[in-house]
Amino acid sequence: MQTRNAFSWLKKQITRSISVSLMIYILTRTSISSAYPIFAQQGYENPREATGRIVCANCHLANKPVEIEVPQAVLPDTVFEAVVRIPYDMQLKQVLANGKKGGLNVGAVLILPEGFELAPSDRISPEMKEKIGNLSFQSYRPNKKNILVIGPVPGKKYSEITFPILSPDPATKKDVHFLKYPIYVGGNRGRGQIYPDGSKSNNTVYNATAAGIVSKIIRKEKGGYEITITDASEGRQVVDIIPPGPELLVSEGESIKFDQPLTSNPNVGGFGQGDAEIVLQDPLRVQGLLFFLASVILAQIFLVLKKKQFEKVQLAEMNF
């Protein structure tokens, strides 16, 4: 009986431990994912707004360049490279969530035409796999295979990202046609300045929420500050909380205005977007073009031969 009770108690403890561990894992994963660019998947059905703006710009406020390179034209059911470049100064360090400095991560979203999608691994050549490295791409939504996201990944290693893309075949996909299509890309380097809920991260500037005198500055044990602003005319006090990371620009006794920066702007990253065009080429059209070029070349050759033959006949008549 005691053995059965002991076994039952042990079983309950193991079950409880597993449940707690699973809960911690889920919470940790959620907090981590919400801090990175792909959180847009959770809040937006489509990453590109009707205005053409990519939603990543809502959280990454600084404007930075991004480049995309794709072939001018591709044939149906072929794998090609879409190369996205996210340039930045590799010597830069960003403010991390804990207030310390670290390297920049990068991320990208690639919006392909309907029908285009990530190439399956068995269709990717060894040379292309070497360019891709250890990157793991995912669809923006299960039903939106033409929109791909990647990141965050180390910027020093992946400031150039190669997407392996499979072109559609109009013979099997009736809604796809041989046309010129646009491709849109968004790329960021570094952390954002605003979280999905609208709150600020520690990677941005903090402004005064009231005008008055800085009456007290308390440096918090884990980093950051509590700044007390006293409005002498109204006799009220406002406390602004500064997280670890940004550098303080004001001192006690200083008179400040409403919305005046209390800190520096630590952000060294930013987001950019661009576009390109690609033609889904009809193989029959290519064959027709090659046939036409071959016929033109043959016609030129026959014309030259005919001209030489005519010159020989003329020369023979003159000698006669």
From Swiss-Prot:
TM spans (from-to): 286-305
PANTHER family with a match to the protein in the record: CYTOCHROME F, PTHR33288
Secretion signal, residue range per the UniProt entry: 1-35
InterPro entries in the cross-refs: Cyt-f_TM (IPR024058), Cyt_f (IPR002325), Cyt_f_lg_dom (IPR024094), Cyt_f_lg_dom_sf (IPR036826), Rudment_hybrid_motif (IPR011054)
GO terms under biological process: photosynthesis
Job description of the protein: Component of the cytochrome b6-f complex, which mediates electron transfer between photosystem II (PSII) and photosystem I (PSI), cyclic electron flow around PSI, and state transitions.
HAMAP family in UniProt: Cytb6_f_cytF (MF_00610)
Binding-site residues for heme, renumbered to this chain: 36, 56, 59-60
Membrane topology: Single-pass membrane protein
Cell location: Plastid, Chloroplast thylakoid membrane
Protein's recorded name: Cytochrome f
Alphabetically ordered keywords of this record: Chloroplast, Electron transport, Heme, Iron, Membrane, Metal-binding, Photosynthesis, Plastid, Signal, Thylakoid, Transmembrane, Transmembrane helix, Transport
Species per Swiss-Prot/TrEMBL record: Atropa belladonna
GO cellular component, one term: chloroplast thylakoid membrane
Family: Belongs to the cytochrome f family.
Pfam families attached to this UniProt entry: Apocytochr_F_C, Apocytochr_F_N
Cofactor annotation comment: Binds 1 heme group covalently.
Main location: plastid
Gene Ontology MF: a single term: iron ion binding
Cofactor: heme
Assembly: The 4 large subunits of the cytochrome b6-f complex are cytochrome b6, subunit IV (17 kDa polypeptide, petD), cytochrome f and the Rieske protein, while the 4 small subunits are PetG, PetL, PetM and PetN. The complex functions as a dimer.
